[in-house]
Amino acid sequence: MAARLCCQLDPARDVLCLRPVGAESRGRPFSGPLGALSSSSPPAVPTDHGAHLSLRGLPVCAFSSAGPCALRFTSARRMETTVNAHQFLPKVLHKRTLGLSAMSTTDLEAYFKDCLFKDWEELGEELRLKVFVLGGCRHKLVCAPAPCNFFTSA
């Protein structure tokens, strides 16, 4: 069972704030760059990675100031992947990212399914893209031994 997150775009800071679903107001937001097309190399995860929050199914990188690896990968200008569609992947993702300002609040699963998988389902490449997104994270989970999987329903 993976953790469920609410995504909320903060247009003032141009970041996507992530909060566990049902968390009290004391929970701090997890932010990651959304519009900035940065490098796909994940920065070091801070020592205070939020393990005290006991969120099942979240990789340690979810508590990084740069945000979860999967979100960083979607906004990367260059994605070093085995996905054959890499030559047009950034353009499609950039186009879809520009439309995020209309979003209010949604969960991470719906965000990825809409932004990443819709076009590739039609091309029959969803599985390879899914493997890239899930397999790209090199960080360990905080409280669960299962593989990093943002798409499993709670």
From Swiss-Prot:
It comes from Hepatitis B virus genotype D subtype ayw (isolate Australia/AustKW/1991) (HBV-D). The lineage of its organism: Viruses, Riboviria, Pararnavirae, Artverviricota, Revtraviricetes. May form homodimer. May interact with host CEBPA, CFLAR, CREB1, DDB1, E4F1, HBXIP, HSPD1/HSP60, NFKBIA, POLR2E and SMAD4. Interacts with host SMC5-SMC6 complex and induces its degradation. Interacts with host TRPC4AP; leading to prevent ubiquitination of TRPC4AP. Interacts with host PLSCR1; this interaction promotes ubiquitination and degradation of HBx and impairs HBx-mediated cell proliferation. GO terms for cellular component: host cell mitochondrion; host cell nucleus. Disulfide bonds: none annotated. Multifunctional protein that plays a role in silencing host antiviral defenses and promoting viral transcription. Does not seem to be essential for HBV infection. May be directly involved in development of cirrhosis and liver cancer (hepatocellular carcinoma). Most of cytosolic activities involve modulation of cytosolic calcium. The effect on apoptosis is controversial depending on the cell types in which the studies have been conducted. May induce apoptosis by localizing in mitochondria and causing loss of mitochondrial membrane potential. Belongs to the orthohepadnavirus protein X family. This is Protein X. Its main location: host cell. A fraction may be phosphorylated in insect cells and HepG2 cells, a human hepatoblastoma cell line. Phosphorylated in vitro by host protein kinase C or mitogen-activated protein kinase. N-acetylated in insect cells. GO terms for biological process: DNA-templated transcription; symbiont-mediated activation of host NF-kappaB cascade; symbiont-mediated arrest of host cell cycle during G2/M transition; viral genome replication. Keywords: Activation of host NF-kappa-B by virus, Activator, Apoptosis, Host cytoplasm, Host G2/M cell cycle arrest by virus, Host mitochondrion, Host nucleus, Host-virus interaction, Modulation of host cell cycle by virus, Transcription, Transcription regulation.
